[in-house]
């Protein structure tokens, strides 16, 4: 592996990139990869090492933002454990699948799907403000699980914008408002799904450990500050950031 010289400036830049990516992601309910991964590549890391470092950072989004959202009483622990434990096996399967089949052919299709969901969200203007959790029956739990499994597989396979899909699931299926949906996505996805991805790269020896303190510190601080701002600003602000992030993700997938 051709790792560039890890000077103090390089390590400082990785901290700043991790902070910015996780701050934005904590507001948008995802999208850290739109910022952090390209910056790590521009700094000269080989792709596999940049991806491993990105996964390490976003694995700590759930700890920083999740702690802040937990303090605010925004975590539904039933949904938290359901999201994490139901999705983890498919995240692992998606990660293994990625080594055998590229996701390039799927990206334009996923971009169109996300843009369609953005358009639907814009047409249904009141959904994001109403927090009226749906009473869950066994049939609804099974249906929600069937919807969640491909999202978890996608998170392990292609990864870009995975949080957008789960945020929509909370908004449209569980009938959460934007703040609660963002809190659940960042907490459950961050702690469970992203940590699994980070663990896979650690096991394979891809992680650049010299960058770990800066990446983790930036992720914890950025996600905590982002969650704090989101709680302060509320649903309307979070909805704008979420739809902006979703639109950018879709356009990048369509390239």
Q: What do these predicted ranges mean?
A:
Residues 45-54, 78-79, 175-186:
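Membrane-interface alpha-helices at helix entry/exit sites of multi-pass transporters
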Residues 93, 148-158, 196-205, 249-255:
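Hydrophobic alpha-helical transmembrane segments in multi-pass integral membrane proteins
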Residues 1-45, 132-182, 213:
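Selected transmembrane alpha-helices and immediately adjacent juxtamembrane segments
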Residues 11, 55, 110-114, 118, ...:
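Residues within membrane-spanning alpha-helices of integral membrane proteins
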């Amino acid at each position: 592996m051709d790792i560039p010289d890890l000077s103090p400036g390089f390590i400082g830049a990785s901290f700043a990139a991790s902070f910015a990516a996780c701050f934005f992601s904590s507001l948008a309910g995802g999208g850290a990869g739109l910022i952090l991964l390209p910056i790590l590549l521009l700094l000269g890391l080989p792709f596999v090492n940049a991806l491993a470092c990105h996964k390490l950072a976003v694995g700590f989004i759930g700890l920083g933002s999740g702690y802040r959202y937990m303090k605010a009483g925004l975590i539904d622990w039933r949904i938290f454990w359901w999201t994490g434990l139901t999705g983890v096996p498919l995240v692992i399967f998606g990660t293994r699948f990625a080594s055998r089949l590229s996701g390039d052919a799927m990206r334009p299709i996923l971009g169109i799907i996300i843009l369609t969901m953005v358009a639907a969200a814009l047409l249904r203007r009141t959904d994001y403000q109403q927090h009226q959790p749906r009473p869950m029956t066994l049939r609804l739990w099974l249906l929600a699980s069937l919807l969640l499994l491909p999202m978890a597989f996608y998170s392990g396979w292609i990864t870009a914008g995975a949080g957008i899909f789960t945020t929509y699931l909370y908004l449209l299926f569980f009938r959460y408002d934007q703040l609660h949906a963002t809190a659940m996505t960042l907490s459950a996805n961050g702690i469970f799904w992203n940590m699994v991805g980070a663990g896979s790269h650690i096991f394979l020896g891809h992680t650049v450990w010299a960058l770990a303190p800066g990446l983790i510190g930036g992720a914890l601080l950025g996600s905590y500050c982002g969650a704090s701002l989101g709680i302060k600003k509320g649903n309307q602000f979070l909805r704008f950031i979420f739809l902006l992030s979703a639109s950018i993700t879709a356009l990048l997938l369509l390239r």
